[in-house]
Amino acid sequence: MRVRITPSRAEGCAVAPPSKSMAHRLLICAALSEGESLVEGISCSEDMGATLDCLSALGASYTREGNAVRVRGFDPRMSNPKTPLLPRESGSTLRFLIPVAWLSGNETTFRGAPTLMRRPMDIYQVLCREKGMTFSKNGCEITVKGGLPSGEYCVAGNVSSQFISGLMFALPLTDGESIIRIMPPVESRSYLELTRAALSAFGVRVEWENDLTLRIAGGQSYRARRVTVEGDYSNAAFLDAFNYVGGKVTVTGLSEGSLQGDRVYRRYFEALSGGTPTLDIGDCPDLGPILFALAAAGRGATFTGTRRLRIKESDRVLAMETELKKFGTELEVSEDSVTVIPTAFHVPSEPLCGHNDHRIVMSMAVLCSITGGVIEGAEAIAKSFPDFFEKTEALGIKAEKTNEF
């Protein structure tokens, strides 16, 4: 999809979409519960479809009721899927559900998009060798076989918290006590707190023994619940960003007591509007693209903790460097930091590329509201925020969509 945006000012009120991070977690907990749960606030995004499809293939069942999903749970120890699970491009779906698949002694195959299967999976490969399980990768397929034992697990904390969260879902269902030791440095700790909150909502306890150790009692069971997904700070940031490029937008539907690490975006936006700050995004890497974009339109900034942006849906550092250059902005890039150096910010010199990355597309849309411009590959927003352009058009952003690719 190609979108042509003309310079326009956003004004009005917008409701934040449901939190993708929390929705994944609550759906998995519901599927692991005995009986029927209702999860309210589920979008029709690609990532939500991926998690629901994979849970269904493992043995759960679900029905959509408007923006809610009714889930009937299954026993993962009895799971024996006959066809590959399809996580599409969702890293959360794949990494959360591999340990769930390990709970049975049966073989499970995941078949994902090439961009997903290029993302690191070494942590699970190592754990399989250590625990006597199997893990094989062949092109776009990963095949695993358990069963998952209780015990001690050592996991690197600086690759992705998703590996740790995956174990947190599965280990409470094993027979004995387990310990997860996290090797520092620990990044994205806030995502582990989201996992703990989701588990707690369904009656499962995972406790911090210290800053680097999680203790998990075995023999626990998930209890069916009715829960509501809170608003998504990471996607709300793209709506709120219009306030920093001349707009006047009120974003509602966010919980002030949220555990989401991306809630820091408001403080970071204020810092960008007041100078040329140095900001650490190690605990909120999904904010990287929009922060780079606002820095380019403003006075610049330096961002640390950027290493993991290279292993997202795209290499987000390279993607933003490429696209911001079209606006006249240079990036100084090192292994774990990015400095945005604004020069003569101008109308993009050529069409912008979405890099098959929803957050790149939405960041470019915010900038194009200032300068105008064309974004190619804008369909990538379907991954997390399929109605993004409908929401921004309701705010007054002038966007013309065509089905050209």
What positions do the PLM features span?
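Short, structured segments at the rim of ligand-binding sites
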Residues: 1-405
